């Protein structure tokens, strides 16, 4: 028999003491169905084959530096952000106190995807 995993995002935010960067988005009914998380480096580069979109997505220092470079090409950036957020991901967590960009806020709110933050390092948060 398959184990079923389900937790409300609201509970995860509380338990992990996450900062909600998108308070306009209602997190009370968003469910997390996977215990595993995903670092979306390949997706942010535009490769979406075998994307684990049902997992919590975490952006650390490496992804953040790449996103800063990506935002120099507005057309490519918007295309990647549209694909990423339109895939129905449950949320994105930024580690190390990293702040999402204005462009990411806009697209995340468009697709109702919460952006969250933690002061913890990526590996520490993932453990």
How should these model regions be labeled?
Residues 88-127:
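Charged, amphipathic alpha-helical linker segments immediately N-terminal to NTP-binding catalytic cores
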Residues 1-85:
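Gly/Thr-rich phosphate-binding loop signature of adenosyl cofactor/nucleotide-binding cores
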């Amino acid at each position: 028999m398959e184990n079923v995993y389900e937790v409300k995002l609201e509970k995860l935010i509380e338990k992990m003491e996450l900062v909600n960067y998108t308070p306009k988005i209602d997190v009370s009914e968003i469910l997390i169905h996977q215990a595993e998380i995903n670092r979306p480096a390949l997706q942010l580069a535009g490769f979406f084959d075998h994307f684990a979109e049902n997992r919590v997505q975490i952006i650390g220092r490496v992804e953040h530096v790449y996103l800063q470079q990506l935002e120099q090409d507005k057309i490519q950036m918007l295309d990647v952000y549209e694909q990423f957020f339109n895939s129905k991901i449950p949320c994105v967590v930024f580690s190390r106190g990293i702040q999402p960009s204005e462009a990411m806020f806009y697209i995340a709110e468009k697709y109702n995807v919460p952006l969250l933050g933690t002061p913890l390092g990526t590996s520490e948060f993932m453990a």
